[in-house]
């Protein structure tokens, strides 16, 4: 995932807050990991409200502009909705499609998101454990972002372990 420095700088300037030193270091490290040939498997830790989502947003932005898709996995429907809204708002100025796959969607909406994910025509899909089901696939998955991985069950963790050998994984 190589990203034009110019686009990355423009996106960075749109961040409405000043980055903390730890945030800056984490963003640099994640971007460097994503440019290595081996899949990234990185954990970003920190207290609630200290900017982990912005680190994830920067990684997602880099992935999408590199022509790949992002799956954002949350343990609850409420948290998935929050991430969906954050990513949608933060990426609104860019040609990036963000969709939600959760219990808040109708069966028809879920089927549409799954079809678009499989075809590679949606850039970012935020969802719950449904993202790990057999009925969900991605045409060109490049990054999986996992929030609160410790809250997922054994079966889901096995699927996540498999993904770690195939695509970049960022856990928070």
Could you tell me what each predicted segment is?
Residues 38-59, 70-74:
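Walker A/P-loop
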Residues 1-11:
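Single conserved hydrophobic/aromatic residue that forms the stacking wall/gate
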Residues 68-70, 97, 120-124, 140-142, ...:
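Loop/turn-to-beta-strand initiation segments
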Residues 105-125, 135-139:
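Conserved motor-coupling elements within RecA-like helicase/translocase cores
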Residues 59-84, 94-96:
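Conserved SF1/SF2 helicase motif Ia
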Residues 9-43:
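Conserved pre-motif I regulatory segment
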């Amino acid at each position: 995932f190589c990203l034009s420095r110019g686009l990355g700088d423009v996106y960075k300037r749109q961040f409405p807050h000043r980055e903390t030193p730890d945030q800056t270091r984490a963003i640099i490290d994640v971007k460097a990991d994503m440019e290595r040939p081996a899949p990234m498997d990185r954990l970003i830790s920190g207290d609630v409200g200290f900017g982990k989502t912005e680190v994830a947003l920067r990684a997602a932005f880099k992935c999408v502009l590199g022509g790949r898709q992002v799956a954002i996995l949350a343990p609850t429907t409420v948290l998935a909705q929050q991430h969906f809204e954050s990513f949608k708002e933060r990426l609104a100025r860019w040609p990036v499609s963000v969709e939600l796959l959760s219990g808040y969607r109708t069966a028809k909406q879920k089927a549409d998101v799954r079809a678009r994910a499989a075809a590679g025509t949606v850039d970012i899909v935020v969802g719950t454990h449904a993202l790990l089901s057999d009925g969900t696939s991605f045409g060109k998955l490049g990054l999986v972002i996992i929030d609160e991985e410790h809250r997922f069950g054994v079966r889901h963790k096995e699927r996540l372990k498999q993904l770690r050998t195939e695509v970049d994984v960022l856990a928070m």
